[in-house]
Regions:
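Positively charged, polar, low-complexity stretches
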Residues: 1-105
């Protein structure tokens, strides 16, 4: 029997004007209710994004209001972590991770 994804969304709306990696980590921890053991580093972010077992909704949306003001290197790392985390959920039949950024005009 195949379990279907619960289509109820969990929206993590990421605030604007995040100035650095520390602010981004704090915002993600707050909006995604990361556990107390979250280490506020890239490895810990990837681990938590690939778990999210504490969120019961089936569709988890991380919506950015703007692009975080990170260094080019940190922005690349963040993008790669998000892509890898999304990919890690591809075969999961009960959850789906969606990440949104504003369209650049």
């Amino acid at each position: 029997m195949t379990t279907k994804i619960n289509q109820t969304p969990y929206l993590a709306l990421i605030k604007e004007e995040l100035k650095d990696k520390d602010e981004l980590m704090e915002e993600l921890k707050l909006k995604l209710n990361f556990p107390d053991y979250f280490g506020s580093n890239w490895d810990a972010l990837f681990d938590c994004l690939c778990d999210l077992s504490w969120i019961h909704e089936g569709v988890i949306i991380i919506k950015h209001r703007d692009i975080p003001k990170l260094s080019i290197q940190d922005l690349e790392i963040y993008k790669d972590i998000l892509q890898d985390a999304i990919y890690s959920w591809n075969d999961d039949e009960t959850h789906k991770l969606i990440v949104e950024f504003p369209t650049l005009s």
